[in-house]
């Protein structure tokens, strides 16, 4: 879910074409959740193949990632590894929320309620099969992926800070806490999107957030930004009741990088806050990775999607033509640029 900084951070809208020839380290789990939540049937059920296996994420990867490649973007997907021990309670709580949402979805669906779609989205979860299938399809498409030693966003942030990528691609703001210099949002959902439960549509454009701009605007150090996030709530702690971003900002402005003083004023405690802060500042990351794009393998993609997962042959043929053309054009441009 990520930390809630939306009310304090002002992203800068860009056009997708501005990411041409830019490497984006995509938070894989975050993006898969988007695909699984958004790409659904009218009753809220995810897309599935003839055997009942969920395929919404595969649809998102083949069609929407192809859109990004056509714009000249160079995505590299970064998957989560082993989460830190203090994330266990969050993982457990989320599983309980999703199970409750699943039960409400089934009840709403049986009753023919319009609320079914909302509950279906809230029940979205990722299992090992979904992750494995995503990696297979990305590999066949020639899109590189990395498995982080711990949190994918931390690894992606590290890659951008080291110059191996230009942006972290994620809907969450956590990448900023991990030190990502630049984050781009909405790359996977750009275009017209229906407003939930309303018969209206809105334009969704990519948004860029730069860490130094955020710190300068808020008048904080990165350490203080992390303290503020911990007060509001992160992936590793629930935050303090009734302390939102604005209240947290005031407290950090008053006390600076002094969490004990803030907690003393509030009369509250936050379990593991020191370990959480240390993890944001010094997460487990690795230099043992390669970022290399390959050529798509149309025959393997077609077999995987059409024969194994019941995709339409005609639709897959069309998107494969687009993908191979886009990769070919990118290769030509790279070859030409080497002459100058």
Swiss-Prot record:
Region annotation N-domain: where it falls in the sequence: 1-98
InterPro entries recorded: 5-3_exonuclease_C_sf, Flap_endonuc, Flap_endonuc_arc, HhH2, PIN-like_dom_sf, XPG-I_dom, XPG/Rad2, XPG_DNA_repair_N
Q: Which UniProt keywords apply?
A: DNA damage, DNA repair, DNA replication, Endonuclease, Exonuclease, Hydrolase, Magnesium, Metal-binding, Nuclease
Q: Which SUPFAM superfamilies match?
A: 5' to 3' exonuclease, C-terminal subdomain, PIN domain-like
Ligand binding (Mg(2+) 1): 27, 80, 151, 153
Against Pfam families, the record matches this protein to:
XPG_I (PF00867), XPG_N (PF00752)
What's the protein called, per UniProt? Flap endonuclease 1
Species of the source: Methanocella arvoryzae (strain DSM 22066 / NBRC 105507 / MRE50)
